Amino acid sequence: MSDLNFEAMPNKLVNYATLDGIAVIEIASDANGAALTEVNDRSPNTYTHGMMSDLDDAIIRARFDDDVACIVLTGNGSSFFSAGASISMLNSVSPGFKYNFCLHANETLSRLEQTPKLVVCAINGHAVGGGLEIAMAADIRIARKNAGKVGLPEINLGVLAGTG
């Protein structure tokens, strides 16, 4: 994927590129949901409302591009595909915002799941919590050997998986 010229989406939390009929969407955020400016092998690629907005925009962009036949979704770096929602973001917002945030995440992942183009999730590291829910919205999931853990750890806290 080094031949790709990524373009940052508006909030700079998702990068987008196309090559030979494939749209590549890369999640790129730190533990607080802030944008990454370079490859960070330890970044958890957490998501916030801004990241979900960028992901939604990228999905729509790929869907309406007649030259794109397939979408590949991956994470920045090699430690995490995505660790799910930013805990610091969730701790700092109102219950009403959390409700609408989860609703928007549901709508975004439904759009990803229902897009008529083939969606492949390239799991390049841990895919946990909402990160796994993003991966589950793809048609095909493939992980590199020893990529990391896959799971929904929030169930140990009595919380249901809520965005996928």
Model-inferred region functions:
Residues 1-74, 110:
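Conserved CoA-thioester-binding segment of acyl-CoA-metabolizing enzymes
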Residues 20, 66-68, 85, 114, ...:
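Structured loop/turn residues at beta-strand edges in well-structured enzyme cores
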Residues 29-42, 46, 75-108, 158:
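Glycine- (often His-adjacent) and acidic-residue-rich active-site loop
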Residues 49-64, 87-124:
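An acidic, glycine-rich surface segment that forms the CoA-thioester-binding/catalytic face
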Residues 55, 73, 86, 134-135:
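Hydrophobic/aromatic residues within transmembrane alpha-helices
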Residues 108, 112-114, 122, 128-164:
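CoA-thioester-processing core
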